[in-house]
Amino acid sequence: MASIKEELISAAESESQVMQIVQAALEGIDMDALTSMTPGLPQTVRQTAINSLLSSKKLAIQQAPGGVLRLKVNTSEQIAGTEEEQVIYSLIEESKTRGIWIKELREGSGLNQLQLRKTLKSLETKKLIKTIKAVGTTRKCYILFSIEPDMSLTGGTFYSDQQLDSELINTLISVCGSYAASRRKHAIDENPNNIQMQREASYIRPQEIAQFITEKRVLNVPLSLEDLERILEVAVLDGTIERRADGKIRACPPRSSISPLVSVPCAICPVVEDCRPGYVISPQSCDYMKNWLADL
């Protein structure tokens, strides 16, 4: 009886010693380092303690860069499944919203291709994980089923089925430009004799435009302020709006139309003095004149 009790205490103490060392190693600890830090534990006792902690899910094995296996405290959510499913689920969970590629799963788990695909299929069937096709690539990455992927994977509001939605972008640019132009016109009408007031009243905060888009239900999906800022950047480059240092924007003044006479070829023709109707050099035979008239 005393011998059994001594063995139980010895097992509990050895597990406690191993656990304390692993807990102190934030990035995990490899077997060689653990052995050197537990010189008082016989090899069989140490291995028994490790196996017990792994079985109880208190510790987990993780493959570090270079293929070295490390022990670390298991902080992953426990799921009902095989050991392979636990390992794969843990790796996907650690990737959070960024997701993880199948190559990284293979390297991190040490599973062969057949084992990995079987495990992934099982986790997908249980609705514990899902696949995401990232923008700009045909490769799939894996992410927990309950997590929304990072915008860097999906492309955000302006992508539909991994394709840039140009029509949506152009619509939003037009809405932003029209709203800003309406505010500018209102500012001029309200302050006909005060140019400074016209200028100040024509500036608006991006939040006002975002609120307008939401209230008018221009989109069927929420538009974040970050998304709107991306649209406004395009509108600035297009010359539709201008932005000042405090972030407010206003519509650019309407572009004045240029008279076609400005580009009439006669103004720079070196033989204009010899050009006469009915002559060899004449407007009727001038190729430059024909091209200019065609562009009107």
UniProtKB/Swiss-Prot annotation:
UniProt keyword annotation of Transmembrane present: no
Keywords recorded for this protein, A-Z: DNA-directed RNA polymerase, Nucleus, Transcription
GO CC terms, sorted: RNA polymerase III complex
Localization (cell): Nucleus
GO BP term, example: transcription by RNA polymerase III
Similarity comment: family membership: Belongs to the eukaryotic RPC34/RPC39 RNA polymerase subunit family.
Function, as annotated: DNA-dependent RNA polymerase catalyzes the transcription of DNA into RNA using the four ribonucleoside triphosphates as substrates. Specific peripheric component of RNA polymerase III which synthesizes small RNAs, such as 5S rRNA and tRNAs.
Protein name according to UniProt: Probable DNA-directed RNA polymerase III subunit RPC6
Organism of provenance: Caenorhabditis elegans
Organism classification: Eukaryota, Metazoa, Ecdysozoa, Nematoda, Chromadorea
